[in-house]
């Protein structure tokens, strides 16, 4: 339950300004398993001591897609006859609530990380940073599926053309395996050629995966 205001009046320049008290049922973040049905618990509003719920406008509810992992904001708002707007916000996390471990942290590429280009030429690289952010249970965001390859080449004074970082959401399973969603290269949605060997060892804090993008394959090993 969330309240967007702590009373029915505010005082400005010695004048009483009635406000809307928003009372959001349920939690500010609700986790829903992928494929499940989401039923919004809703929000009520009180204005000058009277029920004002029928004046609430809801934005974002229709955008919630439980088949696509991610975070979906829902906004509830009410406007008084005087034109003052009050609101409350909820986030629906489409994730895997069964996952109890956390996979967030700053990771370094480790031995075994390499790029194999379309011609079979291998290039190892280590000690580049990859950030993993925990969004919800079993749902994280990784800032570069390529393991910071282009940043590593730049640091080694071997800059290459077409530098790209690939961001993605990772939906984790209880056994540590995972799949990528909402994949973007430099902020634009893209398709990967392949993604495999994806595991996370919670006890050791080690990520591994193999990703192929535009014909080049990257074997990634990350240590936390």
Predicted regions and their residues:
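Bacterial Sec-dependent N-terminal signal peptides
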Residues: 1-28
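A domain-level signal for the structural core that forms small-molecule/cofactor-binding pockets
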Residues: 7-10, 89-97
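Extracellular interdomain linker/stem segments of modular secreted and single-pass surface proteins
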Residues: 16-19, 94-102
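Solvent-exposed, low-complexity, repeat-rich "mucin-like" stalks and linkers
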Residues: 18-50
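Beta-strand secondary-structure signal
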Residues: 21, 42, 73-75, 206-210, ...
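Generic structural detector for well-ordered beta-strands
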Residues: 23, 31, 77, 91-95, ...
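Serine/threonine-rich, repeat-prone extracellular segments and beta-strand-based repeat modules
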Residues: 49-88, 94-95
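Ser/Thr/Gly/Pro-rich, low-complexity flexible regions
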Residues: 98-224
């Amino acid at each position: 339950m969330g309240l967007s205001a702590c009373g029915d009046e505010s005082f400005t320049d010695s004048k009483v300004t009635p406000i809307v008290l928003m009372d959001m049922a349920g939690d500010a973040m609700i986790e829903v398993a992928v494929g499940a049905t989401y039923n919004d618990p809703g929000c009520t509003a009180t204005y000058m001591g009277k029920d004002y719920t029928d004046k609430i406008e809801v934005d974002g509810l229709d955008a919630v897609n439980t088949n696509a992992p991610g975070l979906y904001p829902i906004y509830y708002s009410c406007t008084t006859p005087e034109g003052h707007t009050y609101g409350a916000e909820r986030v629906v996390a489409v994730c895997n609530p069964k996952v109890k471990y956390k996979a967030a942290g700053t990771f370094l590429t480790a031995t075994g990380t390499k790029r194999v280009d379309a011609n079979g030429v291998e290039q190892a690289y280590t000690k580049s940073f990859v950030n993993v952010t925990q969004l919800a249970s079993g749902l994280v965001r990784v800032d570069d599926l390529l393991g910071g390859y282009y940043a590593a080449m730049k640091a080694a004074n071997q800059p290459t053309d077409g530098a790209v970082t690939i961001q993605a959401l990772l939906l984790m399973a209880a056994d540590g395996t995972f799949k990528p969603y909402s994949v973007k290269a430099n902020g634009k949605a893209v398709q990967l050629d392949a993604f495999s060997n994806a595991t996370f060892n919670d006890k050791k804090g080690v990520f591994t995966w193999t990703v192929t993008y535009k014909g080049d394959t990257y074997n990634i090993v990350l240590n936390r």
